[in-house]
Amino acid sequence: MGIKDWPQGEGPREKLLLDGAEQLSDAELLAVLLRVGLKGLSAVELARMMITEFGGLRSLLTASQAQVCRLDGIGPVKFAQLQAAVEIGKRISKENLKRGKILSDPDLTRDYLMRQLGDRAYEVFAILLLDSQHRVIQFVELFRGTINSASVYPRDVVGLVLEKKAAAVIVCHNHPSGIAEPSTADRRITERLKQALQTIDVSLLDHMVVGDREIVSFAERGWID
């Protein structure tokens, strides 16, 4: 039975309008984007199959076009619809953390970093530059590739901080493996950066490591002070 044949109010679109998007399952939300299913398969059933195939909604939405379009009934148009939804989420997150925003909400920072770095297939080391009142100046990706204590240069970080006249920073990087637990190398990098920033009287507020589903904060673990 297709969604159009469901009793009134039971389809995912109607459910969203009546109860709110937060009440929908992952498959139902995806079905709203897909709009239609396949012959003999409703949009919700197709969505559930897609999520199962990729092992989760996040893995599906960060997969390549070639990977997604290998699924029956999924072509470039549906892939484009999904990517547009993902990009809208990222842009909303950027607006929430736009220049001049006072960084007082840890959850907002986590959400922003997860959206920016959580789906990368390669390592990215980035820095969030703040002024003396902890207002956002800029988010900058500094290094890409295999991040270790030898590939992150404190002088480059210090140079950027001086250029942007930042008074405090949050550094962050992702683990493409999906496991956010910091390594020994991560702790070494943090200590080197902290010492380098102290020479120019700039505070290192945190180092956040982004995994697939979580972010580990050095500050929360007491590793910054």
From Swiss-Prot:
<dbReference type="InterPro" id="IPR037518">
    <property type="entry name" value="MPN"/>
</dbReference>
<feature type="binding site">
    <location>
        <position position="186"/>
    </location>
    <ligand>
        <name>Zn(2+)</name>
    </ligand>
</feature>
<feature type="domain" description="MPN">
    <location>
        <begin position="102"/>
        <end position="224"/>
    </location>
</feature>
<keyword id="KW-0479">Metal-binding</keyword>
<feature type="binding site">
    <location>
        <position position="175"/>
    </location>
    <ligand>
        <name>Zn(2+)</name>
    </ligand>
</feature>
<dbReference type="Pfam" id="PF20582">
    <property type="entry name" value="UPF0758_N"/>
</dbReference>
<feature type="binding site">
    <location>
        <position position="173"/>
    </location>
    <ligand>
        <name>Zn(2+)</name>
    </ligand>
</feature>
<feature type="short sequence motif" description="JAMM motif">
    <location>
        <begin position="173"/>
        <end position="186"/>
    </location>
</feature>
<comment type="similarity">
    <text>Belongs to the UPF0758 family.</text>
</comment>
<dbReference type="Pfam" id="PF04002">
    <property type="entry name" value="RadC"/>
</dbReference>
<dbReference type="InterPro" id="IPR010994">
    <property type="entry name" value="RuvA_2-like"/>
</dbReference>
<keyword id="KW-0645">Protease</keyword>
<dbReference type="InterPro" id="IPR025657">
    <property type="entry name" value="RadC_JAB"/>
</dbReference>
<dbReference type="InterPro" id="IPR046778">
    <property type="entry name" value="UPF0758_N"/>
</dbReference>
<protein>
    <recommendedName>
        <fullName>UPF0758 protein swp_2203</fullName>
    </recommendedName>
</protein>
<keyword id="KW-0482">Metalloprotease</keyword>
<keyword id="KW-0378">Hydrolase</keyword>
<keyword id="KW-0862">Zinc</keyword>
<dbReference type="GO" id="GO:0046872">
    <property type="term" value="F:metal ion binding"/>
</dbReference>
<dbReference type="GO" id="GO:0008237">
    <property type="term" value="F:metallopeptidase activity"/>
</dbReference>
<dbReference type="InterPro" id="IPR001405">
    <property type="entry name" value="UPF0758"/>
</dbReference>
<dbReference type="InterPro" id="IPR020891">
    <property type="entry name" value="UPF0758_CS"/>
</dbReference>
<dbReference type="GO" id="GO:0006508">
    <property type="term" value="P:proteolysis"/>
</dbReference>
